[in-house]
From Swiss-Prot:
Biological process per Gene Ontology, one example term: mycothiol biosynthetic process
Entry protein name: D-inositol 3-phosphate glycosyltransferase
Binding site for 1D-myo-inositol 3-phosphate: 15, 26-31, 84, 117, 141, 161
Organism listed in the record: Rhodococcus erythropolis (strain PR4 / NBRC 100887)
Family: Belongs to the glycosyltransferase group 1 family. MshA subfamily.
Record keywords: Glycosyltransferase, Magnesium, Metal-binding, Transferase
Length: 442
């Protein structure tokens, strides 16, 4: 199928940089998605410029992240110490920076806008109308969905966010959902037109995340080759639920005191509630499993691949996940996954074939599922053998192809006047021409 390609796409990622280390602050799967999809789009002949908010005075205004991929760090508000909840106060400054950059070029410099997360969608909505180009939006997470499955001690998403999401959903020319479940939520909870939603699964870098030697991976991490290693990778926050894994592990250890179980927690602080590693350290102490739990800071991708290879099992106990890149990366390395049956994890993990899906977050349920795997090496080996084959279905190449098709549909809708807005592209270009010529029509 022929897919027409935009010449240059403006990608908006306001609250987190694609260059940030995943697992720290607000950096996670979305950062990986934005950067890796951009790299693959560039390989297909599409120039990508990613606009993100600068968070350090040391951030260069422009960074060439890869051939054809440029990251623009926009100064908007204080560089450090600005809470994510306060970012809406800096959207005007961010918009000004984005529009100022576009104004340096002739109209039509950007063929299309792709916004990620609702804050970026607000910026994209305005830029779309000013530039006269289509807007494609990926939510990544939705307030209404998160609030339906809050972890204990977590803070509900504010009504202002849901209102903002509703506006972006209504104004976008196309919406990209990670899974059919997310597409259903966009329709049922936000009233999105199903015909404007494209389901495009995220992927993994299958050249980096692939099976390897477990013993050498463990040696590089200082892990005992004789232990059964169960690993959590992600931001330490209530939503990701690392405490669920620790409580389940404590129960398993109490049932089988001689079991050589090692829990490896890889990640940094983020969010509210269980936001600091020392809180998890204290939880491990109170559960009596301090000696069986190891904490590591967030790891670079090359090192993270060894973390997956060193593990017998990777746990993803999240309360909400639009997809779950960790699950795909782990399986690509030949490691099965035990995950909560929420959101996109039902797609990322093939239940009973490449891992197990657990209903709910009760300690007894998780302990039972965990015990059924860590005490059955033959079953673990069978799941591990199937895992890479399943992961092969998810690559950033496939993601980029899906995005290009969504971009094509967005352009068709926009140019035919069948998008969500009746704002004419011709009128938009005319307004900019007036602005650029000081109000004199040309």
């Amino acid at each position: 199928m022929h897919i027409s390609r935009p010449r240059r796409v403006a990608v908006l990622s306001v609250h987190t940089s694609p260059l940030a280390q995943p697992g720290t602050g607000d950096a996670g799967g979305m950062n990986v998605y934005v950067l890796q999809s951009a790299i693959q789009l560039a390989k297909r002949g599409v120039e990508v410029e990613i606009f993100t908010r600068a968070t350090s005075s040391a951030d260069a205004p422009v960074v060439d992240a890869a051939p054809g991929v440029r990251v623009r760090n926009i100064a908007a508000g204080p560089f450090e110490g600005l809470d994510k909840a306060d970012l809406p106060t800096q959207l005007c400054a961010f918009v000004a920076g984005v529009l100022r950059e576009e104004a340096r070029h002739e109209p039509g410099y950007y063929s299309l806008i792709h916004s990620h997360y609702w804050l970026s969608g607000q910026v994209g909505w305005l830029a779309r109308d000013r530039w006269g180009v289509p807007l494609v939006h990926t939510a990544h997470t939705l307030a209404a969905v998160k609030n339906l499955s809050l972890a204990e001690g977590d803070t509900p998403e504010p009504a202002a966010r849901q209102i903002g999401e509703q506006q972006v959903v209504a104004e976008s020319d196309r919406l990209v959902a990670n899974t059919t479940d997310e597409a259903k939520a966009l329709h049922e909870l936000y009233g999105a037109d199903p015909t404007r939603i494209d389901v495009v699964a995220p992927g993994a870098d299958l050249t980096r995340y692939r099976p390897g030697d477990r013993d050498s991976a463990r040696a590089s991490l200082g892990l005992d080759p004789g232990e059964i290693v169960v690993t959590f990778v992600g931001r330490i926050q209530p939503l990701k639920a690392p405490d669920v894994l620790l409580r389940a592990a404590a129960e398993v250890i109490s049932r089988s005191p001689g079991l050589p179980l090692r829990i490896l927690v890889v990640g940094g602080p983020s969010g509210t509630g269980l936001a600091r590693p020392d809180v998890l350290i204290e939880l491990a102490r109170s559960l009596g499993i301090t000696a069986q739990v190891t904490f590591l800071p967030p790891q670079a991708p090359e090192r993270l691949a060894d973390v997956y290879r060193a593990s017998d099992l990777v746990a993803v106990p999240s309360y909400s996940e639009s997809f779950g890149l960790v699950a795909i990366e782990a399986q690509a390395c030949g490691t099965p996954v035990i995950a909560a049956d929420v959101g996109g994890l039902g797609v990322a993990v093939r239940n009973g074939e490449t891992g197990l899906l657990v209903q709910g977050h009760r300690t007894e349920d998780w302990a039972g599922a965990l015990e059924s795997l860590v005490t059955a090496p033959t079953r673990l080996a069978e799941l591990a053998a199937q895992a890479p084959r399943h992961a092969e279905n998810f690559s950033w190449e496939h993601t980029a192809d899906g995005l290009l098709e969504s971009y094509r549909k967005a352009a068709v809708n926009y140019n035919n006047g069948t998008g969500p807005s009746d704002f004419s592209p011709r009128r938009a270009r005319g307004l900019w021409r007036l602005r650029r010529t000081g109000g004199v029509r040309t």
